[in-house]
């Protein structure tokens, strides 16, 4: 009979995975990534809000441009959320969570001109693009940093396109 004592470890908030990242790296990375999941969901919805409701000069060009942006944002959002799960987290993307945790201020629903929408979008795209860049510098997980670098490149390009259309 063994005299070894059983040592109970504290329960982990992480889901089991064979991924060997340190638990503290996983935990901090999950928090960073989940905030970005929230921001990307909000940005995708804001983009569609503008897409539906703008009127005026260059409507069709901007309308179609925003559709492409939204598709890419959703693709990045999915990749980021899946990375959360890959490293033992739970991706948080419900409407309730997005409403409580978004970094973006509420999008105005009383604007209609293409220019007003572009200005409102530029402000919000800049916030998300800057938050992604900050997260790249904070994460100690190279795979997550790589995912965020790809998203950062696209967001910077989208912001440039939006700003280039502002008169």
Swiss-Prot record:
Residues bound to Fe cation: 51, 78, 82
Keyword Mitochondrion recorded: no
Keywords in alphabetical order: Cytoplasm, DNA condensation, DNA-binding, Iron, Iron storage, Metal-binding, Oxidoreductase
Enzyme class, first EC level, given as a word: oxidoreductase
Disulfide bonds listed in the record: none
Description of how the protein assembles with itself and partners: Homododecamer. The 12 subunits form a hollow sphere into which the mineral iron core of up to 500 Fe(3+) can be deposited.
Role this protein plays: During stationary phase, binds the chromosome non-specifically, forming a highly ordered and stable dps-DNA co-crystal within which chromosomal DNA is condensed and protected from diverse damages. It protects DNA from oxidative damage by sequestering intracellular Fe(2+) ion and storing it in the form of Fe(3+) oxyhydroxide mineral, which can be released after reduction. One hydrogen peroxide oxidizes two Fe(2+) ions, which prevents hydroxyl radical production by the Fenton reaction.
Entry similarity comment: Belongs to the Dps family.
Species for this entry: Pectobacterium carotovorum subsp. carotovorum (strain PC1)
Record Pfam families: Ferritin (PF00210)
Protein name in the entry: DNA protection during starvation protein
UniProt superkingdom: Bacteria
Keyword Iron: yes
Catalytic activity: 2 Fe(2+) + H2O2 + 2 H(+) = 2 Fe(3+) + 2 H2O
EC number: 1.16.-.-
GO molecular function: DNA binding; ferric iron binding; oxidoreductase activity, acting on metal ions
This protein's GO CC annotations: cytoplasm
Cell compartment(s), UniProt: Cytoplasm
GO BP: chromosome condensation; intracellular iron ion homeostasis
Coiled coil: none
């Amino acid at each position: 009979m063994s005299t070894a004592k059983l040592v109970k470890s504290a329960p982990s908030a992480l889901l089991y995975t064979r991924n060997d990242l340190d638990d503290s790296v996983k935990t901090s990375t999950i928090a960073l990534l989940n905030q970005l999941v929230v921001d990307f969901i909000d940005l995708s919805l804001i983009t569609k809000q503008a897409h539906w409701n703008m009127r005026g000069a260059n409507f069709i060009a901007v309308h179609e441009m925003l559709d492409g942006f939204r598709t890419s944002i959703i693709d990045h959002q999915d990749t980021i959320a899946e990375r959360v799960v890959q490293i033992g987290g739970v991706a948080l993307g419900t409407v309730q969570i997005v409403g409580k945790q978004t970094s973006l201020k509420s999008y105005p629903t009383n604007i209609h001109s293409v220019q007003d929408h572009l200005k409102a979008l530029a402000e919000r795209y800049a916030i998300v693009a800057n938050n992604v860049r900050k997260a790249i510098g904070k994460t100690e997980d190279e795979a997550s940093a790589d995912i965020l670098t790809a998203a950062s490149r696209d967001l910077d390009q989208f912001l440039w396109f939006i700003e280039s259309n502002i008169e």
